Amino acid sequence: MSDILLELLCVSEKAANIARACRQQETLFQLLIEEKKGAEKNKKFAADFKTLADVLVQEVIKQNMENKFPGLGKKVFGEESNEFTNDLGEKITVELQSTEEETAELLSKVLNGNMPASEALAQVVHEDVDLTDPTLESLDISIPHESLGIWVDPIDSTYQYIKGSANVKSNQGIFPSGLQCVTILIGVYDLQTGLPLMGVINQPFASQNLTTLRWKGQCYWGLSYMGTNIHSLQLAISKSDSETQTENSDREFSSPFSAVISTSEKDTIKAALSRVCGGSVFPAAGAGYKSLCVIQGLADIYIFSEDTTYKWDSCAAHAILRAMGGGIVDMKECLERSPDTGLDLPQLLYHVENKGASGVELWANKGGLIAYRSRNRLDTFLSRLIQNLGPVKTQA
């Protein structure tokens, strides 16, 4: 199984290279944007966009997984269809070709004959990426490939990607908007149980060199399977743990909470959160990025009461958080159940469609979500949130 995760790290980095390449040329970037229509449209945004970068990234992930693990590429699911319409109204199916030249030829149809741009993109698509991790290479875990499914969000926070703001200031390490909020999300789940098993989050625009204006990325991963829990932040955490263990156990129950939220969150939730968290409520763009803030320890909780996140938004982060001892739960179910029932938390699952839905809504996280790293912190947070929501709690 670690061989799959190693391959996902490599394809996520190739995907990040594509995302960066598409942004570096403004004229090229304008060509790549196409508005999403019909059943594909995410109802949260007035104008949602499909970019060729989105489609290319998803196809690269599919093709690479299929080449390395035959059959697995067919079980890569995501938000994007690989059909693109050019300015002449021609529908083009975007697929990786066997050679760089053939891929460039296909891309030139999408890009209205712009061969230099097509060749530049094809080069990045066919470039080999070698990303290794000694921890993963030494891990020996076996799981049949046929029992796995993969959720992909090729470019989460497409709006921030298109807008391309590079000079947004962070608030206590959390960026409210900007390219830092863009993530590539790859989550692996069990087709039978729906549990998330492996996750990769690649942040292509983590930091910018102010001299060269080049962007550097950062990659995070986690694996949670049959009692094995391992993640990329383990070394960083274990170094500080020995010094702060007592302090952390006290903090579980005493200190204020911090939460990261969507700018579109309901006023009732915002008001309750301000009573629970005081001034430590941070708005930020992108479901993937907000989950990453919890993974990084920048916030205790990511909470979202709406039904406009999807399985591809949450699966990768959920797997990493499980490896850390946390998870992502259904917010509505959490607020409706009695805390003293002793029931397991309603973790999000990834294998069952929503009944009666169509299009992307088949895979919406209908009850909203709460992402967390610490179960103890979550329990305390939930009891305080319920107290502060009062009678409106079941409407979330």
UniProtKB/Swiss-Prot annotation:
Q: Which GO terms describe its molecular function?
A: inositol-1,3,4-trisphosphate 1-phosphatase activity; inositol-1,4-bisphosphate 1-phosphatase activity; metal ion binding
Q: What is its EC number?
A: 3.1.3.57
Which protein is depicted? Inositol polyphosphate 1-phosphatase
Summarize the activity regulation: Inhibited by Li(+).
Q: For this protein, what reaction is catalysed?
A: 1D-myo-inositol 1,4-bisphosphate + H2O = 1D-myo-inositol 4-phosphate + phosphate; 1D-myo-inositol 1,3,4-trisphosphate + H2O = 1D-myo-inositol 3,4-bisphosphate + phosphate
Oligomeric state and interaction partners are given as: Monomer.
**List of residues binding Mg(2+) 2:** 153, 313
User: Where is Li(+) bound in this sequence?
Assistant: 54, 80
Question: Coiled-coil ranges per the record?
Answer: none
Q: Which PROSITE patterns match?
A: IMP_1 (PS00629), IMP_2 (PS00630)
Q: Which organism is it from?
A: Mus musculus
**Which residue positions does Phosphoserine occur at?**
314
